[in-house]
């Protein structure tokens, strides 16, 4: 931005063309905004480069940063020279555009790989044009808008960073990391641009701008006028660098700068002769905020309004416009902020002309204008000086900061600087600091300084953005100053009324709202400085007047004092001198060496003399204090008012102020003090200041009172010696002369602060701290100066300080330096707090209330100072100091009548708890419990008091009760892990940690923001401290991560956990609950918590979600969940049956113990983390053991209720609302888990885990209560499934932000819901008796808990109660079942509904299929006949057959998708086998559907889901196809059917009728080996949710099947499914289902125990198989087969669901029937020992548990049943045979396998006729055989059985296809257990893949 040319030295050389220079007479803002291109042209870039970017989805891929560049001093000086040379011409009145601040925009960051990166855009490139449109003159926001509004392509013209003059010149500033001083040697400093900055001699070195005197009529004016501007002739400003900090955002100002001059930028009070007075400042004056005392606004207005029209008629609105260019003000201004005349172009030409002489003053060697970079060791110094001269030392960064609203409440930009106090200490340009020494000081780039010294900024035309951001800098003057001015004026100083100086000029002090919004942003502290500065600048006219240096000495002293006074301003001595010069025409012009302090005092005094500056009002205005000739400076504040002058005036002032600015600095400092206690200052001023003339004549005399306050004489500008602490200009000048103790000398803020701290300490020791003193000691402006520089300053009464600030007069002198001096205490003046102005005496008592901003400033300074003080370098030391000062400040603030205006930036009651001691050791909650404290945030310290203190006399030492916490460089964040309390934030200092609890979140955030802002006041210290803390925190975190501790952050939890109960109680109450308890509930919780089982440190299992170690990327998600889910997603998405197959219990237990020990350093590469089944079981175990389940106990009933809503849309909406209402940890964890489960379900084709299967596994685990409510477990199981399934299916909708869109519901979901409301839990009742662990105890099968869950309920007591419950449930169930026997009751459970639904669908589908397949019809007919016969048999005992048939189907389905198959299979099978005739068409369809569901998921789909699938896609499948496809289940089919019938199915497989529930339950109980999943379910009192997919569906199916079986033959298929799934599920569910079955219903219900089961089994076996002699053998074989997976063969028959077989069924059905008959006979012959079968089942269950072998066994049983069903076609005789086979099934599996093998051989032979089918069958058989051979002999039997079953099923009902499904299921089950569901390739060779089975059977059938 050429405009910033000033920044670019070379370019800067080129004067901007007049065109580009917009007359400054116009608002600077306008100019800044209107940077003319000519300026741009002035730059000699190597040339910008053009970059074209294409907009991508994420945008253009780069971010910008905004810098406001202020013109180099040289440029300003050049313009000044031009003016001096008479070149003002048209532009004379206004600074050139190039001198205007320029908005520069740089590329902050380029996203790698983004469009910008590809286009070659680089970080640091400066944007010149956007789409061909120059950015010059545009605000940052406008440029951003241009970019954002560009089309798909964006053309940028950029200046590469390495070619950008601005960046080269301001390399450090541009990328300032704080305001770090340049650390390199001069040689390393980048060469300044070739442009040589002309050593412009400050023309108005004094910068004595004619002070505009407000009309005496104006109270302000009067006040101000009383003191003519002290034309403190500034010495050459060489080291003068005015750093005016921009106050933080206006809000800050309001917050902190309650003080005077609320005129933020909004109010630019222009001190204009009354005629010209424009209420610019007043308009701009920010009255907002307490800053404006009620009167304040008026004063500012008055100031503006009252500018003496007569006195300064010619002066433009700009108050102290440099009327006296001659005074050098103009010249100075350029150096000052470049404001010089340019800024004050508005000033009348005459004034401008006058300025030349001042310029000459500038010319003085010290003057900044001469600044030549070659004179400085480092470029940075040069820049700093130049900047000081020109911009008030504001760096770009500073300006940016201010623009950014100084996110940090850098109240004291300088305070941060104080850190630099060290040799390099960056001082806010204290006058002395400003000395070339400035090199020592941290150098800021000009822009930085600008930022620091908003005053200058204000005077500068702001860049467009700045303007937009802040009101004219001038406009805002220190509110504090203004306030105190006003107050002073109002109070004692109504006298402030503009006095007519002896010279007759009226001293009208226009208050400048010295602070721009930036100032405000910056913070009160800065403001005070700035304010002071502004005052000095603005008041220069006045302020200077008050302290007019009679000669250059005065001027110089004044300037210097100002500079020192204005901590922010680093003024070169010359510059400072110049500023005073502004006040004094003559003295200001004469660049005299600073007068001795006495001279200064003289200057301060010589109001009229200085005032005599050409601008009449300039002289007058300067005397803010109305010093009548009597020499009493009544109104120092007027100076401030002067500052308030309009922007133009401000410009002039700025120049003047630049000279004065330094002066002002001192003034400002004093002013800050004075602002703090305006009354004090006023009084002081009055006391101190004699008539301006008198003072002028006798500055010493005036200062004499100040003698106590020893102003240090600033080293000559040329001196490199560490600049003495900047004296407040007047005071220094005066005092120095007097040689009063240096104590009075104004130190840079740091020094002052140190001194102040020391004083405070002394006072504390003495117990007396005069508020005034404390103020005085506290540099208002945290002007960094080396503390060492600060000589022990005698306490400068705050009042003195204030006075000084108010009027350069050595008001300070008046105040006794002694800390105790009752000097008017500076009271904070709150806008409301006018009494702040109360008599000094009162104020003394009450630590003067400073205006809030003043106090804050002081406090900040103090605190910063403390921290910043070299001595305070150590945080602890600093803290101590802070404690002292802050306490003082805080007390003063406390004293302040109004808290709002108190020094505190924020205060209020907080609960507080210390986490660590000074040594960093953790403090237990019992030792340091939560306490309610009144917390006051002052500056960089927090004061903790037991209660709110309002006493005004606190300025003395902080009370013992008060605890001080230094927050410089602290880290503050929201605490989540340290306590369970809400709204807690943690404050970490260098050595301690504290927790604070706020009332609500907003309050907490407000505190955090305030503390962050106040803790960042000292750049260097803050940065260093923050770095230390951050590194410390990182170390802690790393330690925590590497150690076994689970705590992410050191947390008191561990200690609390180890505490005794009493201690826990004591600690827990404050720690965990908001104290004190508000109600009984709270007390109860408090009482309960200590006794609740506290998780061990770092515990993961069995602890609340919010206590679990958080994941690395989401603090709300437990680490274990994150790790397990990621591992499964990385490695297990293709693992068949993931989550269904349990892991090794021992491994799971071991990992749980390890994680519970707090080991969060998980090495996922470790072998133990390689077993996915263990990992999946670990995850399930975690959720099972949650004390508060994922869906929370509180909302459990709501979820169940919501799930049962009729309207699916309403249901989903309600569920979503409930989910959103979950606690954060629960919500985020649920969101994460459901997303993971959705990911798993998306891979269901490979892993066979459709949403329904996952829901079966996770439903009871996630949706549960902590209580062992078996009824809920059973009755709500379908709801639990459905809720989880819905979550998985609609994860995106549930967890998306947009909830407006209506959820999309599917038919199957709705049907499921419909089926859910009244789940039939009869089949679960037996399970309840058998198994029962509390949900918490329920463990994954892999976990040790699983055994417990299976083995027992838990403690004896619980067991007993459970038994009672179980017995009652059984009785109810038995009654129900009896009824069901009479008629098929569609149980409320989804299973039954699904079955019914499925049957309907099947019938439809089947009908369709028959149409498709001609063969199907015959088969269907046969199947129907079979089904009918089966029904009859089933009714009789043929149910077993039906069940078998169904089981085949079910197995096929259930194994592929266990949940659905039971239901689906049952109806289809019933339809096919039993009801074949009636449902001829349905059968094929059903088979197909079954095949689909089975093949799809590799597990049985629940019936309802299958039904829905069927409904969704009815189709005919060729037998082969069916065989393979049956397994493929639609996800939809899975969804609707949540059956808990896995055990039932198992029973069905065995022929649930034959096997009594007891037997089944026994088998299941014995089969504790049953899937861990099942055990999990059982343990939870829920159907086995664990690994076997079929468990629940089977249950549901079997229940339904039993009912249906009783009523229909459908039930058997479900039972088959159960079997396929595994005996365990069967056992659990089957007992009930079998009870439903007519035989066992009552008996089984009663008999839950193993004996009963065994008996029933035996009975069944006996009844079923008359020829069971072979049963034992068969049984053993079957057992082996089962163990090895023979069940697969059984499953296969089930898999041969008739739906698939429709086409073949006619043929195959008959064949199968024949075969079945034969096989039935064989089976009967093979073995009919039911007991053996039961044992086999048990074994199978065992296997099932690990593998789904049990299911396979059941599958075999199912196959038998299927054969029986096939036989039913032959007739009930066959059914009886089948029945016999059923008892034999377990053992007969082997025999059956053999039989099947034989049969297959025969079949194959017979079927060879159908070569292809036969071959296929043979291959299948062969495959089976191979697998069998691969596996032990048992496996081969199983294979045989598998083959047999398929054959059997095929012949009866085209079950060949289904059979493969079953087989697949069996395989899949085993696979599932082994995480391998692939039917074709099974982990167990003895298992045949579903496809193989299907093929073999198919061929056999053929």
Curated annotation (Swiss-Prot):
Q: Which residue ranges does the record assign to the Rho-GAP domain? A: 1103-1295
Read off the SMART domains from this record: PDZ, PH, RhoGAP
Composition-biased stretches, type Basic and acidic residues, lie in 1068-1082, 1575-1585, 1601-1613, 1634-1652, 1661-1673
Annotated region Disordered: the residues are 1-44, 78-97, 284-317, 348-369, 409-450, 581-603, 613-632, 879-902, 1039-1095, 1306-1357, 1375-1394, 1494-1520, 1559-1704, 1729-1748, 1803-1890
Protein name (record): Rho GTPase-activating protein 21-B
Principal localisation: Golgi
Ranges of Basic residues compositional bias?
1737-1748
Protein's job = GTPase-activating protein (GAP) for rhoa and cdc42.
Q: Which residues form the PDZ domain?
A: 77-162
Key words, A-Z: Cell junction, Cytoplasm, Cytoplasmic vesicle, Cytoskeleton, Golgi apparatus, GTPase activation, Membrane
Q: Which GO terms describe its cellular component?
A: anchoring junction; cytoplasmic vesicle membrane; cytoskeleton; Golgi membrane
Q: Site (Arginine finger): which residue positions?
A: 1140
Tell me a GO biological process for this protein: signal transduction
Does the keyword section mention ATP-binding?
A: no
| Recorded GO MF terms | GTPase activator activity
Which InterPro entries does this entry report, sorted A to Z?
A: PDZ, PDZ_6, PDZ_sf, PH-like_dom_sf, PH_domain, Rho_GTPase_activation_prot, RhoGAP_dom
Q: Which Pfam families match?
A: PDZ_6, PH, RhoGAP
Where is this gene product found? Golgi apparatus membrane; Cell junction; Cytoplasmic vesicle membrane; Cytoplasm, Cytoskeleton
Q: Which residues form the PH domain?
A: 903-1016
Bias (Low complexity) occurs at 305-317, 1339-1357
* Membrane topology qualifier: Peripheral membrane protein
> Which residue intervals are annotated with compositional bias (Polar residues) in the record?
10-22, 409-424, 1039-1063, 1494-1511, 1614-1630, 1865-1878
């Amino acid at each position: 931005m050429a405009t910033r040319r000033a920044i670019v030295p070379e370019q800067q050389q080129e004067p901007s063309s007049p065109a580009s220079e917009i007359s400054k007479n116009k608002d600077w803002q306008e100019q800044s905004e209107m940077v003319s291109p000519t300026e741009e042209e002035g730059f000699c870039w190597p040339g910008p480069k053009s970059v074209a970017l294409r907009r991508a989805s994420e945008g253009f891929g780069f971010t910008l940063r905004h810098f406001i560049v202020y013109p180099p001093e040289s440029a300003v000086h050049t313009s000044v020279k031009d003016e001096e040379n008479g070149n003002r011409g048209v532009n004379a009145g206004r600074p050139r555009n190039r001198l205007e601040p320029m908005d520069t925009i740089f590329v902050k960051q380029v996203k790698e790989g983004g469009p910008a990166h590809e286009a070659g855009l680089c970080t640091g490139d400066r944007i010149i044009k956007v789409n061909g449109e120059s950015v010059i003159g545009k605000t940052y926001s406008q440029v951003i808008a241009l970019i954002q509004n560009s089309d798909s392509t964006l053309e940028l013209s950029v200046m590469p960073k390495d070619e950008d003059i601005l960046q080269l010149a301001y390399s450090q500033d541009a990328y300032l990391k704080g305001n770090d001083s340049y650390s390199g040697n001069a040689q390393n400093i980048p060469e300044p641009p070739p442009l040589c900055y002309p050593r412009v001699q400050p023309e108005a070195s004094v910068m004595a701008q004619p002070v505009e005197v407000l009309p005496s009529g104006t109270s302000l004016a009067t006040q101000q006028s009383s003191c003519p501007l002290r034309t403190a002739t500034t010495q050459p400003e060489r080291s003068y660098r005015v750093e005016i900090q921009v106050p933080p955002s206006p809000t800050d100002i309001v917050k902190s700068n309650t003080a005077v001059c609320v005129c933020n930028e909004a109010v630019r009070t222009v001190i204009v002769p009354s005629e010209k007075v424009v209420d610019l400042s007043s308009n701009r004056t920010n009255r907002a905020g307490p800053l404006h005392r009620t009167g304040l606004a008026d004063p500012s207005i008055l100031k503006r309004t009252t500018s003496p029209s007569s006195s300064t008629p010619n002066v433009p609105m700009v108050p102290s416009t440099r009327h006296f260019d001659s005074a050098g003000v103009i010249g100075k201004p350029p150096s000052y902020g470049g404001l010089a005349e340019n800024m004050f172009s508005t000033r009348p030409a005459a004034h401008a002309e006058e300025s030349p002489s001042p310029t000459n003053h500038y010319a003085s060697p010290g003057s900044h204008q001469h600044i030549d970079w070659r004179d400085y060791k480092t470029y940075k110094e040069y820049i700093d000086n130049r900047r000081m001269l020109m911009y008030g030392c504001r760096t770009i960064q500073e300006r940016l900061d201010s623009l950014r609203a100084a996110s940090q409440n850098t109240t004291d930009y300088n305070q941060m600087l104080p850190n630099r106090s060290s040799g390099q200490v960056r001082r806010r340009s204290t006058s002395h600091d400003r000395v070339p020494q400035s090199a020592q000081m941290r150098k800021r780039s000009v822009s930085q300084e600008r930022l620091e010294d908003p005053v200058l900024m204000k005077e500068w035309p702001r860049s467009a953005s700045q303007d937009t951001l802040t009101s004219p800098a001038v406009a805002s003057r220190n509110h504090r100053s203004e306030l105190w001015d006003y107050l002073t004026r109002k109070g004692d100083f109504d006298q402030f009324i503009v006095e007519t100086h002896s010279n007759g000029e009226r001293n009208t002090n226009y208050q400048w709202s010295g602070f721009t919004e930036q100032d405000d942003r910056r913070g009160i502290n800065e403001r005070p400085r700035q304010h002071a500065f502004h005052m000095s600048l603005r008041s220069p006219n006045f302020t200077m007047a008050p302290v007019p240096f009679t000669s250059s000495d005065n001027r110089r002293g004044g300037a210097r004092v100002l500079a020192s006074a204005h901590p922010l301003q680093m003024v070169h001595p010359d510059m400072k001198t110049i500023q005073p010069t502004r006040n004094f025409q003559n003295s200001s012009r004469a660049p005299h060496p600073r007068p001795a302090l006495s001279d200064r005092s003289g200057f301060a005094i010589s109001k009229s003399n200085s005032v005599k500056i050409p601008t009449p009002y300039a002289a007058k205005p300067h005397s803010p204090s109305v010093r009548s000739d009597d020499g009493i400076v009544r109104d120092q504040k007027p100076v401030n008012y002067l500052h308030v002058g309009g922007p133009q005036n401000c410009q002039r002032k700025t120049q003047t102020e630049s000279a004065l600015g330094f002066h002002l600095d001192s003034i400002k400092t004093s002013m800050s003090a004075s602002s703090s206690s305006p009354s004090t200052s006023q009084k002081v001023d009055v006391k101190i200041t004699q008539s301006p003339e008198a003072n002028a004549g006798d500055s010493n005399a005036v200062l004499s009172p100040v003698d106590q306050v020893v102003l240090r004489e600033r080293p000559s500008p040329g001196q490199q010696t560490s600049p003495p602490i900047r004296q407040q200009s007047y005071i220094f000048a005066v005092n120095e002369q007097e040689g009063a103790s240096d104590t009075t000398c104004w130190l840079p803020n740091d020094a002052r602060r140190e001194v102040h701290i020391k004083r405070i300490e002394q006072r504390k020791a003495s117990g007396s701290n005069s508020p005034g003193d404390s103020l005085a000691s506290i540099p208002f402006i945290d002007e960094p100066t080396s503390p060492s520089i600060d000589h022990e300053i005698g306490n400068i009464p705050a009042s003195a300080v204030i006075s000084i600030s108010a009027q350069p007069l050595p008001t300070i002198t008046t105040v006794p330096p002694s800390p105790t001096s009752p000097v008017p205490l500076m009271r904070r003046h709150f806008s409301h707090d006018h009494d702040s102005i109360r008599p000094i005496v009162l104020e003394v008592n009450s630590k003067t209330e400073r205006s809030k901003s003043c106090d804050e400033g002081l406090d900040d300074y103090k605190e910063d100072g403390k921290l910043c003080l070299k001595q305070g370098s150590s945080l602890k030391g600093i803290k101590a100091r802070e404690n002292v000062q802050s306490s003082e400040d805080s007390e003063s603030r406390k004293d302040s009548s109004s808290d709002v205006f108190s020094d505190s930036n924020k205060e209020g009651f907080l609960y507080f708890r210390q986490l660590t001691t000074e040594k960093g050791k953790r403090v237990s909650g019992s030792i340091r419990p939560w306490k309610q404290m009144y917390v006051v945030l002052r500056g960089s310290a927090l004061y903790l008091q037991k209660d709110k203190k309002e006493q005004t006399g606190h300025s003395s030492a902080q009370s013992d009760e008060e605890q001080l916490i230094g927050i410089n460089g602290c880290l503050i964040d929201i605490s989540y892990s340290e306590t369970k309390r809400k709204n807690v934030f943690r404050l970490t200092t260098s050595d301690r940690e504290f927790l604070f609890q706020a009332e609500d979140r907003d309050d907490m955030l407000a505190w955090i923001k305030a503390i962050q802002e106040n803790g960042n006041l000292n750049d260097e210290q803050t940065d260093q401290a923050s770095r230390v803390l951050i590194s410390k925190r990182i170390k802690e975190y790393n330690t925590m991560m590497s150690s076994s501790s689970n705590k992410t952050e050191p947390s008191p939890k561990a200690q609390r956990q180890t505490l005794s109960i009493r201690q826990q109680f004591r600690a827990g109450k404050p720690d965990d609950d908001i104290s004190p308890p508000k109600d009984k509930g709270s007390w109860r919780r408090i009482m309960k918590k200590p006794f609740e089982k506290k998780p061990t440190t770092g515990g993961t299992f069995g602890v609340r979600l919010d206590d679990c170690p958080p994941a690395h990327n989401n603090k709300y998600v437990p680490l274990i969940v994150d790790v397990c889910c990621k591992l499964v997603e990385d490695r297990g998405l293709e693992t068949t049956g993931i989550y269904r197959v349990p892991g090794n219990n021992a491994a799971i237990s071991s990992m749980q113990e390890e994680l519970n020990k707090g080991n969060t350093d998980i090495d996922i590469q470790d072998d133990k983390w390689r077993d996915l089944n263990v990992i999946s079981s670990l995850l399930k175990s975690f959720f099972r053991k949650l004390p508060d389940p994922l869906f929370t106990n509180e909302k459990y009933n709501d979820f169940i209720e919501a799930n049962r809503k009729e309207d699916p849309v309403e249901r989903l909406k309600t569920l979503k609302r409930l989910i959103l209402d979950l606690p954060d940890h629960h919500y985020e964890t649920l969101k994460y888990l459901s997303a993971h489960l959705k990911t798993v379900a998306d891979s269901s084709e490979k892993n066979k885990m459709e949403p329904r299967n996952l829901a079966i596994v996770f439903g009871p685990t996630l949706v549960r209560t902590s209580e062992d409510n078996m009824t809920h477990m059973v009755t709500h199981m379908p709801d639990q499934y459905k809720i989880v399934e819905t979550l998985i299916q609609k994860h995106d909708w549930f967890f998306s932000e947009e909830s407006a869109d209506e959820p999309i519901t599917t038919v199957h979901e709705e049907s499921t819901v419909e089926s859910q409301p009244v789940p039939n839990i009869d089949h679960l009742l037996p399970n309840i008796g058998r198994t029962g662990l509390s949900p918490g105890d329920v463990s994954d099968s892999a976990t040790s808990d699983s055994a417990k869950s299976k083995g027992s309920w838990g403690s004896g007591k619980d067991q007993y109660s459970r038994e009672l419950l179980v017995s009652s449930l059984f009785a109810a169930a038995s009654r129900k079942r009896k009824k069901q026997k009479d008629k098929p009751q569609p149980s409320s459970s989804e299973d039954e509904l699904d079955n019914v639904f499925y049957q309907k669908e099947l019938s439809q589908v089947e009908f369709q299929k028959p149409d498709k397949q001609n063969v199907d019809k015959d088969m269907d007919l046969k199947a129907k006949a079979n089904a009918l016969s089966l029904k009859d048999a089933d009714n009789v005992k043929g149910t077993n057959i039906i069940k078998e048939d169904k089981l085949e189907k079910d197995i096929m389905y259930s194994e592929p998708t266990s949940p659905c198959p039971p239901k689906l299979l049952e109806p289809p099978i019933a339809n096919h086998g039993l009801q074949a005739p009636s449902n001829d068409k349905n059968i094929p369809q059903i088979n197909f559907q079954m095949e689909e569901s089975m093949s799809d998921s590799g597990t049985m789909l629940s019936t309802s889901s299958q039904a829905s699938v069927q409904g969704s896609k009815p189709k005919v499948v060729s037998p082969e196809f069916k065989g393979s496809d049956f397994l493929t289940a639609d996800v939809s089919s899975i969804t609707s059917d949540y059956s808990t019938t896995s055990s039932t199915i198992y029973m069905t497989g065995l022929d649930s009728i034959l096997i009594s529930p007891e037997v089944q339950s026994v088998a299941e109980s014995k089969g504790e080996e049953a899937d861990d999943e099942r055990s999990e379910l059982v343990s939870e009192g829920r159907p086995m949710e664990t690994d076997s997919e079929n468990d629940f569906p089977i249950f549901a199916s079997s229940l339904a099947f039993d009912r249906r079986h009783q009523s229909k033959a459908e039930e058997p298929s479900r039972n088959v499914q159960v079997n396929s799934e595994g005996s365990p599920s069967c056992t659990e569910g089957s007992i009930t289902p079998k009870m439903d079955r007519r035989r066992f219903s009552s008996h089984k219900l009663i008999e839950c125990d193993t004996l009963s089961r065994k008996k029933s089994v035996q009975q069944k076996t006996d009844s079923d198989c008359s020829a069971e002699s072979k049963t034992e053998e068969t049984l053993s074989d079957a057992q082996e087969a089962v163990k090895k997976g023979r069940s697969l063969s059984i499953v296969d028959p089930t898999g041969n669901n008739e739906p698939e077989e429709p086409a073949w069924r006619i043929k195959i059905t008959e064949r199968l029937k024949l075969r079945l008959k034969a096989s039935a006979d064989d089976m009967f012959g093979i073995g009919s020992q039911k007991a053996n079968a039961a044992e086999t089942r048990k074994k199978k269950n065992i296997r099932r548990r690990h593998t789904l072998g049990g299911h396979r066994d059941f599958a075999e049983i199912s196959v038998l049943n299927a054969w029986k069903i096939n036989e039913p076609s032959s007739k009930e005789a066959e059914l009886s045979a089948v029945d016999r086979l059923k008892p034999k099934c377990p053992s007969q599996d082997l025999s059956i396998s053999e039989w099947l093998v034989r049969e297959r051989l025969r079949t194959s032979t017979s079927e060879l006729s159908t070569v292809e089918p036969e071959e296929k069958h043979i291959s299948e058989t062969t495959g089976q055989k191979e697998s069998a051979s691969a596996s032990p002999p048992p496996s081969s039997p199983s294979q045989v059985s598998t083959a047999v079953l398929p054959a059997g099923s095929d012949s009866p009902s085209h079950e060949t296809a289904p059979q493969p499904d079953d087989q697949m299921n069996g395989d899949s089950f085993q696979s599932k257990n082994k995480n391998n569901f692939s039917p074709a390739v099974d982990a167990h060779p003895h298992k045949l893949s579903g496809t193989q089975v299907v093929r073999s059977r198919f061929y056999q059938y053929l």
